Amino acid sequence: MKTLIHVALLASLAAPLAWSAGTVKVYTPDSEKPKTLTHAEHLLDLVGQPRLANSWWPGAVIAERQKTAEAEQQHKALLARLTGLAEQEDGDDAAAINSVRQQLQTLKVTGRQNVNLDPDEVRVTEKGNPTLEGEYTLWLPVKPTTVTVMGLISSPGKKPFTPGRDVASYLDEQSLLSGADNSYAWVVYPDGHTQKAPVAYWNKRHIEPMPGSIIFVGFADHFWTKAYDGLNADILHSLIQRIPE
């Protein structure tokens, strides 16, 4: 009897582990409809799939369902904040804020997880192969051939990527809108990390974005009131959380 109880106890302990294994919807460039992977207990069970071997991992994004709901609410709050700020301004200032809001409205965000998805790194990095519990979505984009410029600039959008070209030169053809930071821009790389790039004549550094990066020109701290505190950081957060195209 003790043996039977012991076996039953082990079974009851094992059941939640099997139940908690991740379910992942995988979007690949060759199909509009996602494929579903079930019973993925660790990250390597997902990214180590042979069918994904040729994926462009620097731009891959994995998101968790509950975190996605949070990210969507945060992005919605950001858009509402920009709307409110624009209503408090007029003229060129209001137009600049509305331009940024319109650019951000086109973004779709998700609950991006801060994890390296390159299978080689997952295999060898300490704590690089975390467990998967719950519902996830993985996006695997085609390697882009463009860089996106956005923010308080005259002509936001995609620009052809040119090897060796630095952040400042991508902005040379732009006019800055009212209240823009004319000394620094932010680079949001496809893997989600960011870098502050000096772009003025007095502090310029040669920083090259990679294909798929976003160059963001934000609000100048000295120009705006304290109502704008943290706004650039909130915008960068949404850009990091964007769903790849």
Specify the residue positions occupied by each region the protein language model found.
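Sec-dependent signal peptide recognition
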Residues: 2-10
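A general, composition-driven signal for non-globular sequence regions
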Residues: 10-13, 190
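N-terminal signal peptide c-region/cleavage motif recognized by signal peptidases
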Residues: 15-17
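Ser/Thr/Pro/Gly-biased, low-complexity, turn-/loop-rich segments
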Residues: 19-245
